[in-house]
């Protein structure tokens, strides 16, 4: 029932405060905070969106692309080559401030929604997200065919942290859509950005953003903050615990 | 049943971790090795970031080596004096190893150096151990008498100055080779992220001619000290010690180590050395195969610093 209640509420919201000038959107997440506890194995978040159709003369948005980006991190992609029979890292490329998590959910395959140029400009689709690389002393994104870029996307996809779902956005009514955002158990902690873009006849119509937080709570948070803020104490406590466990096992199994 | 690891930041099955701890603990108790050279790669395989794996394994090794050391201490098999002399070299070696680690990482060839060091060290030591213990077993099978150690038959490096008597080990040798061995273990340990027990045990047996069981017991004591220092070092410098991961591993590890210690004493020394030699050789081969076979993906992605 809760799943139905949310879009209904949104509909009311849209009707109450309608601004007909441009196609506006009202977005809502089933929860804005993913909490990590000791039995956390991943979570799913449902995004609801209502698009105001605006004046009748304007084309109604036909497509939606939802992009979720996790906190940025810097990565290095290494290329191996055979050297004297052994595979050696010979070349590397730094990816600066790349999202640690990247989900692209669309109402259909992005390449069917708009032209490659538009998609690239709008950073819509996994291949169209800007990934800044350091090349020599320059900072730039490269062509999508760049082997390092492709390898980076391939590795992140294999880790389950990058993915694209062409049927990830579902229209439940002409102007109401729903998208399910899976957060895997290995998802990095931090602030996530949800960007929703609507398209009509291949041109972007409107855009909306939301933020989402993945955070450790309770015991997990206590351990993580202790390790950060009191490293000496944490180290000593861990070392003592280790010796304690060793001693107890020794006493428990003592036979002579 | 899964459990979320707060520092490694991923969920894992708690029973997989326990089983891993018990299996590696058994081996570490049996042969007096820390088990890091087995545990660290297995954790990385489970998805734990390498920096967290190396740091957390040290808690497991501290616990299981403490448990093992206590057992051997009670049986009066630990040569504390030998251990202390080894430690003086070991701690200096650790420092040198940490510096080398930093220099190599700056030049981007750390992984390769680690792999090649593994292959060379494990290959050499494994082959030597297997060959020697097979010879010993063959002699026994033929009913020949084993060579009795004669006091005058020491190689040149044991006859160097600064001689010291190690009663427990029944040796009277120069401290120079002892400190050198300690230094080498410390250096390799810091560089390769291992306790070094599997290198130290054969070094004590073959180079210093310490009895097998005393070698194992003394190596365990050394592992205990270096690993406790490693916990503190990793916790303070990198904040990569996952206490939850460490706790699950050490509970399994200490239980496994108890059975391993008994199994080790039930086996004749030659067979124990043969088994350890085969194990070391197998791990070395595994690393070699990994380096030689064409990897599934020629590209790899690593997270920059950030110490995650």
Regions found by a protein language model. Name each.
Chain A
Residues 23-39:
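N-terminal edge beta-strand
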Residues 51-54:
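Short solvent-exposed capping/turn motifs at the termini of beta-strands
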Residues 190-196:
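A short tyrosine-centered beta-strand micro-motif
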Residues 182, 205-235:
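Short, aromatic-rich amphipathic segments at membrane interfaces
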Residues 7-16:
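Bacterial N-terminal signal peptides
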Residues 18-22:
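Sec/Tat signal peptide C-region and signal peptidase I cleavage site
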Residues 82-188:
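Membrane-proximal low-complexity regions enriched in glycine and acidic/polar residues
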């Amino acid at each position: 029932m809760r799943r139905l209640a949310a879009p209904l509420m949104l509909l009311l919201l849209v009707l109450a405060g309608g601004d007909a000038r441009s196609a506006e959107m009202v977005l809502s997440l089933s929860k804005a905070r993913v909490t990590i506890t000791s039995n956390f194995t991943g979570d799913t978040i449902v995004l609801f969106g209502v698009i105001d159709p605006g004046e009748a003369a304007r084309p109604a948005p036909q497509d939606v692309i939802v992009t979720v980006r996790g906190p940025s991190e810097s990565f290095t992609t290494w290329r191996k080559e055979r050297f004297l029979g052994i595979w050696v890292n010979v070349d590397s490329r730094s990816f600066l401030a790349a999202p640690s998590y990247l989900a692209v959910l669309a109402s259909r395959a992005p390449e069917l929604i708009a032209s490659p140029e538009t998609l690239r400009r709008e950073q819509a689709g996994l291949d169209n997200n800007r990934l800044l690389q350091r090349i020599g002393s320059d900072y730039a994104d490269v062509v999508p065919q760049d082997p390092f870029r492709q390898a980076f996307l391939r590795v992140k996809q294999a880790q389950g942290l990058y993915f694209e779902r062409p049927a990830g956005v579902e229209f439940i009514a002409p102007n109401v859509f729903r998208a399910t955002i899976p957060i895997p158990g290995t998802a990095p902690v931090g602030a996530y950005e949800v960007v929703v873009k609507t398209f009509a006849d291949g041109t972007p119509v409107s855009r909306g953003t939301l933020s989402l937080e993945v955070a450790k709570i309770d015991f997990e948070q206590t351990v993580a903050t202790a390790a950060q803020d009191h490293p000496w104490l944490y180290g000593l406590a861990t070392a003592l615990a280790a010796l304690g466990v060793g001693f107890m096992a020794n006493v428990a199994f003592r036979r002579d | 049943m899964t459990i979320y690891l707060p520092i490694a930041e991923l969920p894992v099955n708690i029973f997989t971790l326990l089983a891993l701890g018990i299996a590696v603990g058994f081996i570490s108790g049996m042969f007096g090795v820390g088990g890091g050279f087995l545990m660290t790669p297995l954790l990385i395989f489970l998805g734990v970031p390498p920096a967290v794996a190396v740091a957390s394994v040290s808690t497991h090794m501290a616990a299981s080596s403490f448990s093992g050391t206590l057992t051997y201490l009670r049986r009066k098999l630990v040569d504390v004096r030998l251990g202390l002399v080894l430690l003086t070299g070991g701690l200096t070696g650790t420092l040198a190893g940490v510096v080398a680690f930093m220099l190599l990482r700056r030049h981007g060839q750390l992984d390769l150096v680690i792999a090649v060091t593994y292959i060379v060290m494990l290959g050499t030591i494994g082959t030597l151990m297997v060959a020697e213990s097979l010879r010993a077993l063959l002699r026994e099978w033929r009913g020949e008498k084993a060579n009795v150690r004669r006091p005058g038959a020491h190689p040149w490096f044991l006859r160097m100055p600064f001689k010291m008597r190690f009663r427990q080990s029944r040796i009277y040798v120069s401290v120079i080779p002892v400190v050198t061995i300690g230094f080498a273990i410390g250096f390799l340990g810091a560089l390769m992220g291992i306790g070094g027990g599997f290198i130290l045990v054969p070094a004590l047996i073959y180079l210093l001619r310490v009895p097998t069981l005393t070698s194992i017991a003394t190596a365990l004591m050394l592992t205990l000290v270096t690993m406790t220092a490693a916990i503190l070092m990793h916790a303070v410098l990198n904040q990569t010690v996952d206490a939850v991961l460490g706790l699950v591993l050490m509970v399994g590890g200490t239980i496994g180590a108890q059975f391993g210690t008994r199994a080790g004493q039930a086996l004749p020394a030659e067979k124990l050395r043969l088994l350890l030699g085969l194990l070391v050789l197998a791990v070395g081969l595994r690393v070699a195969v990994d380096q030689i076979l064409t990897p599934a993906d020629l590209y790899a992605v690593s997270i920059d610093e950030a110490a995650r």
